[in-house]
């Protein structure tokens, strides 16, 4: 079973519409993989300056339900480090055994961890921003673009 963590920046600068867009974009990417939800365990984590909420999704139905029911928790400042600490603890408890990647949707204005973990990380932005320069060089920076 492969595992993926999707973290969503729920600080005051990210709207519910933006959070739902992040989830929609992720679903589009993941659903293109053959039998994705039959082989994956996906953590969806909301974080502003601390972990506000998380859910583990194992199926397409659970994903759709989560997208419909999601409420934004947080709205404070942004600190990316609690998600990395959450992952470390889940790995220590053996709840995460085969983590492939962390995808972190954000506007980029926050505190980044200093050390690279043992899994791939991508910080995903809706548009290019000055904050992208703060992303550590060991992480990917992706821009999904704005819809018109």
Whereabouts are the PLM-identified features?
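Von Willebrand factor
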Residues: 1-59, 62-106, 109-111, 124-132, ...
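Extracytoplasmic/secreted cell-surface and envelope-processing proteins
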Residues: 15-16, 110-115
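A short acidic, amphipathic alpha-helical/loop segment
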Residues: 21, 114-117
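Conserved beta-strand scaffold positions in the cores of enzyme catalytic domains, especially
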Residues: 44, 121-123, 141-143
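Short, structured coil segments at secondary-structure junctions
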Residues: 117-119, 137
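Short, charged, surface-exposed secondary-structure boundary motifs
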Residues: 131-139
């Amino acid at each position: 079973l492969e595992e993926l963590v999707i973290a969503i920046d729920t600080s005051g600068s990210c709207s519910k519409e933006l959070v739902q867009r992040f989830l929609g974009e992720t679903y589009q990417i993941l659903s293109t993989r053959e039998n994705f939800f039959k082989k994956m365990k996906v953590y969806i984590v909301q974080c502003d300056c601390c972990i506000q909420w998380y859910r583990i999704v194992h199926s397409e139905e659970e994903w759709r339900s989560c997208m419909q029911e999601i409420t934004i928790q947080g709205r404070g400042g942004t600190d990316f480090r609690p998600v990395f600490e959450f992952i470390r603890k889940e790995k220590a408890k053996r709840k995460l055994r085969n983590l492939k990647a962390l995808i972190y949707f954000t506007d980029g204005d926050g505190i980044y961890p200093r050390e690279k973990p043992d899994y791939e990380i991508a910080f995903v932005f809706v548009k290019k921003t000055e904050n992208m320069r703060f992303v550590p060089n060991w992480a990917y920076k992706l821009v999904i673009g704005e819809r018109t």
